[in-house]
Regions:
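Short alpha-helical transmembrane segments in multi-pass integral membrane proteins
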Residues: 2-59, 115-180, 221-234
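Transmembrane alpha-helix boundary and packing residues in multipass membrane permease domains
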Residues: 12, 25, 61, 65, ...
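Membrane-helix interface segments
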Residues: 85-86, 200-202, 227-228
Length: 234
């Protein structure tokens, strides 16, 4: 039977559960020496002295992620006032833009681990070198994405939209968000590096303030006559 939207939801949950099951299975069955998690007791009590550091590092990031979702919902509500085509462009546009932020997120995760490892070993020169190399790579990648979005918005949009209204909105979206791709990539990478140093509180404060500023800025630009494009610029 056709499950439509419910089918997509079921498929997503099923896939996530299977990935989780495979990972847990491999953790407890892999005999590799590097598998330090094999003897892990997930439900055993651990020393109280670890609570403070776990809370100090993890809580700011958790709050940041939660507030980011809430802010995104508010912005989506604002976009919905401009019709179904605007919502579709926001959704698909975010997926198109993922070629930039997903890459940056991968570098951030790698740099997080690299920075933490070398910070613990007091190899500060390696931290600076790793950041410098990552900065160069992501700057080039971000500029390539910027050029593609700004110079080729219509061909890219045409891969996903065919009706004139959605196509026009998508072209504007790609041009506007295209200008920030390099900056966004470097931002995500830097957050990864600082988090590796244990500075998650600083990252979260900056991110929450600036991300939260999107809402009043979007309202201001929208009512200033920019319409939907005001939300994209925000």
């Amino acid at each position: 039977p056709r499950l439509e939207t419910a089918g997509a939801a079921i498929a997503t949950v099923t896939a996530q559960f299977l990935v989780f099951a495979v990972l847990v299975f491999r953790i407890f069955t892999s005999g590799l020496e590097t598998n330090v998690l094999r003897e892990l007791h997930l439900f055993s009590r651990f020393p109280r002295k670890f609570y403070k550091n776990i809370f100090r590092i993890g809580f700011p990031t958790a709050i940041q992620s939660m507030l980011y979702c809430m802010i995104s919902m508010v912005l989506t509500r604002m976009v919905s006032a401009f019709g179904a085509a605007a919502i579709a462009v926001q959704r698909v546009g975010g997926q198109i833009e993922s070629v930039s932020w997903n890459t940056a997120d991968g570098f951030a995760s790698a740099l997080n681990a690299f920075t933490a490892q070398n910070f613990g070993a007091k190899k500060y020169d390696r931290i600076r070198q790793g950041y410098r190399i990552s900065f160069g790579i992501l700057t080039i990648w971000g500029l390539i994405i910027t050029a593609a979005f700004v110079l080729l918005p219509r061909p890219i949009s045409g891969l996903f939209f065919h009706d004139p209204e959605s196509l026009g909105i998508s072209v504007n979206y790609l041009i506007i968000i295209g200008f920030c791709e390099a900056f966004m990539a470097i931002e995500l990478m830097t957050i990864g590096a600082l988090s590796g140093l244990g500075m998650t509180k600083l990252c979260s404060i900056i991110s929450i303030i600036l991300t939260g500023a999107r809402i009043p800025l979007a309202m201001l630009l929208t009512h200033a006559g920019m319409g939907l494009n005001g939300i994209w610029w925000a």
